[in-house]
């Protein structure tokens, strides 16, 4: 497994297009359960918000974003990794960064995203609840997770 040297930094305004593309590519690779209409609607919502959101980025040696995380207090609202960099420790690096700052970190994951559920469980997250609908009332069940050291 290739583990290229990645570092972390806070996002800056010029990162907007790159993080939006990471989100789109990651969703295309992992969220095949979304209907086409919902995928389009969610894309529009994310495109309005994500480029200016205060993110933590994982960047490669050329300072190109390869993944990002959005923290909101003690909750991780988002974690997305460019498909070409999955399995290289990028997501783990971002989550460990958050856990070092926020013991008991919580996050939510789509129930249908088995890969993400397994990833979080391997890092010590446990289910603490479930919602039948996502945050926008769409029929995509959410598992609520909390890190238990």
Where are these regions (language model features)?
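Conserved beta-hairpin
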Residues: 54-67
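A short helix-loop-beta-strand connector motif used in the catalytic cores of GNAT acetyltransferases and
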Residues: 45-57, 75, 138
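A short, internal acetyl-CoA/4′-phosphopantetheine-binding micro-motif in the GNAT/acyltransferase core
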Residues: 75-86, 110
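Conserved GNAT acetyl-CoA-binding A-motif
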Residues: 101-112
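Conserved acetyl-CoA-binding loop of GNAT-fold acetyltransferases
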Residues: 121-130
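Conserved GNAT-fold acetyl-CoA-binding loop/helix
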Residues: 16, 20-50
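Conserved N-terminal entry element of GNAT/NAT acetyltransferase domains
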Residues: 1-14
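Conserved acetyl-CoA-binding loop-helix of GNAT-fold acetyltransferases
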Residues: 87-100, 118, 122
